[in-house]
A protein has these predicted regions:
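Conserved NAD(P)H cofactor-binding loop of Rossmann-fold oxidoreductase domains
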Residues: 94-99
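Residue(s) in the substrate-gating loop at a strand-loop-helix junction
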Residues: 146
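C-terminal helical subdomain
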Residues: 186, 204-241
Length: 275
C-alpha cells in the first residue's frame, strides 16, 4: 500500500493555473502546504490568484506569464527556475485547449498550437524536471488528460489525439519510475464545470452533467496517494471508458460522432474551446 503523498514544503509548478482545474489544483496544493509556481498566459489573473493564496493560506506563491505554444516557452520557465534557485518537486501539466469543428475547417496554425500546448509543453516540462526529482528520490507528475483519450473524437480530432498521447505517455513514464519514488498520474476527467464547453453548450454536445473542479482535483490527489498510473473521474465516466473496449474502433468513432455533432449544418465554423 502506497503512502499518501506529502506536499508540505514541496514546490509545485502548475500550468494553466489561472482558471478551471489549474486554479483548483493551486488551492488544493496550497491547503496541503506546498509552495507554488503558477504558469499561464494571463498576468492579471495569476497575480490575483497568487495574492489570494498568500492571503488565505499563508502560501509561498510565485507566478510566471508564459504562452506554452511559444517555441521558447519551456526555456523561459527553465531560466526562471535557475534565476530563482527553485527546484520543482511536483509538476501539474494542466494547460490545454480544444479546437472544435470539422478537421479541415480549423486553421492548421490553431491545431498545431493545440499539439504544442497539450502535448509538447507537457513532454518538455516533464523532460526538464524529472531528472531533478530522480536525483532527490521523490516527486510527482500529474498530466491532465481527458475521457477523450479513450476513443476517437470527431469534431475534436486533434484534441482527442493529444489526450490519448498524454494517457499513454503518463503510463509509460509511471512504469519507468515506479520504483524510484516518483509518482505519475494521467487524470482523465469528463465534462467539468469550467468554460471549456461554454461555446458549444453541454446539452448540444451531449457531454453529460459537468463535474465541479474541486471533485476532479480531489480524485487526482486520491489517485496520487495510491500511486495509480491513471484515473478516470466519476463512476459514469469509468463505465463509459471501459465500454469502449467492447466496441470496434469504427463503431466507437461513429457513436462519438453522433454525440459531438452540432445540431446545425456539419460544415459549421470552427470554434476554440479553452480548458
Amino acid at each position: 500500500m502506497s503512502q499518501s503523498f506529502d506536499f508540505r514544503g514541496k514546490t509545485a509548478l502548475v500550468t494553466g493555473a489561472s482558471s478551471g482545474i489549474g486554479r483548483a489544483f493551486a488551492y488544493a496544493l496550497a491547503e496541503r502546504g506546498a509552495r507554488l509556481l503558477l504558469v499561464a498566459r494571463s498576468r492579471d489573473k495569476l497575480r490575483d490568484l497568487a495574492a489570494e493564496l498568500r492571503r488565505d493560506h499563508a502560501c509561498d506563491a510565485d507566478f510566471l506569464t508564459v504562452d506554452l505554444s511559444a517555441a521558447d516557452a519551456v526555456d523561459t520557465i527553465d531560466r526562471h527556475l535557475k534565476e530563482t534557485g527553485t527546484f520543482v518537486d511536483v509538476l501539474i501539466n494542466n494547460a490545454g485547449f480544444a479546437a472544435y469543428g470539422r478537421f479541415e475547417t480549423i486553421p492548421l496554425t490553431r491545431q498545431r498550437d493545440e499539439v504544442l500546448v497539450n502535448c509538447v509543453a507537457a513532454l518538455e516540462l516533464t523532460h526538464l524536471l524529472l531528472p531533478g526529482m530522480q536525483a532527490r528520490s521523490g516527486g510527482a507528475v500529474i498530466n491532465v488528460a481527458s475521457t477523450a483519450a479513450f476513443q476517437p473524437d470527431p469534431y475534436m480530432a486533434v484534441y482527442g489525439a493529444t489526450k490519448a498521447f498524454l494517457l499513454s505517455f503518463s503510463e509509460a513514464v509511471w512504469a519507468e519510475n515506479r520504483h524510484r519514488g516518483i509518482r505519475v498520474v494521467a487524470l482523465c476527467p469528463g465534462a467539468t464545470q469550467t468554460a471549456f464547453f461554454d461555446v458549444v453548450g453541454a446539452k448540444e454536445a451531449a457531454v453529460g452533467v459537468p463535474m465541479p473542479v474541486a471533485n476532479v482535483v480531489r480524485d487526482a490527489l486520491w489517485a496520487l496517494d495510491r500511486n495509480l498510473s491513471y484515473r478516470v473521474v466519476g463512476a459514469r465516466n469509468r463505465l463509459l471508458a471501459n465500454l469502449q473496449r467492447l466496441l470496434s474502433r469504427q463503431m466507437s468513432a461513429r457513436l462519438v460522432e453522433k454525440i459531438l455533432r452540432p445540431r446545425e449544418d456539419p460544415d459549421f465554423a470552427a470554434t476554440d474551446l479553452k480548458a
